[in-house]
Amino acid sequence: RATINSMFFTIPTIMTWTRIVAIPLIIGVYYLDSLKVETQNLIATVMFVLFAWTDWLDGFLARKLNQTSAFGAFLDPVADKFLVCAALLILVHMNRVHVLIALVIIGREIAISSLREWMAQIGAGNSVAVHMVGKLKTTVQMMAIPFLLYDGILFGSIDTRDWGAVLILIAAILTIWSMVYYMKKALPEIRARVK
């Protein structure tokens, strides 16, 4: 019988929890008035990259340590969504991401998360299981956000603002594509229950 610790506090789930804990820390950096904006950007970028890396690490550890669980499978994408959405809100506030792009991405996350929850309740969760396009969307988001947080020139020649703008646009396109994909997968189940 699973204990509370074995469900919620395995090494992989602790790594996942850190992504949620990261949110107020990253936001808090921008309230440290004693730091220059460039320093705030650098710290927030490094923190985001480190915490986003745990998305790969927790999955690797879960398989390596044989500590996969239903709770871990649930928490992992939730932590990703919280981290990405919080970062997008910061970037909108700082005029580094257009509000429409942020609304598309955040709106999709809410819509598909709700769809998945409903499909799971009716026993059809497998029809909207995570697909490669969804994983690609998350990867591009995780690449775009650090560039936009840094907001400067990297290694003397890489303008992270330009790269970030292109990547977040690609992420928005993938966001819409993945939403259409999941909706099409769910449609037969929805129609069957409307009849």
Model-based region annotation:
Residues 3-12, 17-18, 22-23, 41-52, ...:
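C-terminal membrane-associated helical module and adjoining short loops/tails
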Residues 18, 62, 78-85, 139-143:
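Loop-to-transmembrane-helix entry motif
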Residues 29-36, 61, 65, 93-96, ...:
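Juxtamembrane transmembrane-helix termini
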